[in-house]
């Protein structure tokens, strides 16, 4: 299991490679993780190498290679930290309740739940319309939601698998109209298509990034994209 800092650094390196084509500098990694010295970055990279997530090309500058990303719910820590990178809190939903994602003590504390609407399927591949139907609902632990209004959507497709978001997962969304770069959002395109993607602002344009190398980034004028909410957690049924 990766530590939170190891996981955060791995996602940061992977994102930087996707955006720029080369590795971030040690200073950039230090600043991104809010560490005081570069020695902490060296230790994190060594640990990621030992666990088979990262490879260093020692005779080249800024040459890190991401070999694999962790499978959420097994390698990744629960999402309670800060920063814009999404680390899913995956709750295994069984017939007897919620299991596996929290310790026994925290599950016991999460018996108090709130019912939120489940709005059909959202594409994690090509965008599709979301079904705005309040007839289906899902019970979610209150402590998982925090403040604000929430709703749920079922993920369809595989374009976000490298962020640990799988086909059939139930995405828990905090309703809001703004988000920071790097956050995973529900985006409404041209008032008719809805998709779950990572947000990147590029001047007057908005890029919607997949977390799967087989999918291209889609770029739109900002006025064509409206943010419908931000991903805060996942439910997964086995």
Swiss-Prot record:
GO BP terms in the entry: DNA repair; DNA replication; negative regulation of DNA-templated transcription; proteolysis; SOS response
UniProt site (Cleavage): 124-125
Active site: 159, 197
GO molecular function annotations of the record: DNA binding; serine-type endopeptidase activity
A Pfam family of this chain: LexA_DNA_bind
Domain of life of the source: Bacteria
Protein keywords: Autocatalytic cleavage, DNA damage, DNA repair, DNA replication, DNA-binding, Hydrolase, Repressor, SOS response, Transcription, Transcription regulation
UniProt DNA-binding residue ranges: 26-46
E.C. number: 3.4.21.88
Reaction catalyzed: Hydrolysis of Ala-|-Gly bond in repressor LexA
Similarity comment: family membership: Belongs to the peptidase S24 family.
Role: Represses a number of genes involved in the response to DNA damage (SOS response), including recA and lexA. In the presence of single-stranded DNA, RecA interacts with LexA causing an autocatalytic cleavage which disrupts the DNA-binding part of LexA, leading to derepression of the SOS regulon and eventually DNA repair.
Record NCBIfam families: lexA (TIGR00498)
Subunit structure: Homodimer.
Protein name in the entry: LexA repressor
Record organism: Gluconobacter oxydans (strain 621H)
Taxonomic placement: Bacteria, Pseudomonadati, Pseudomonadota, Alphaproteobacteria, Acetobacterales
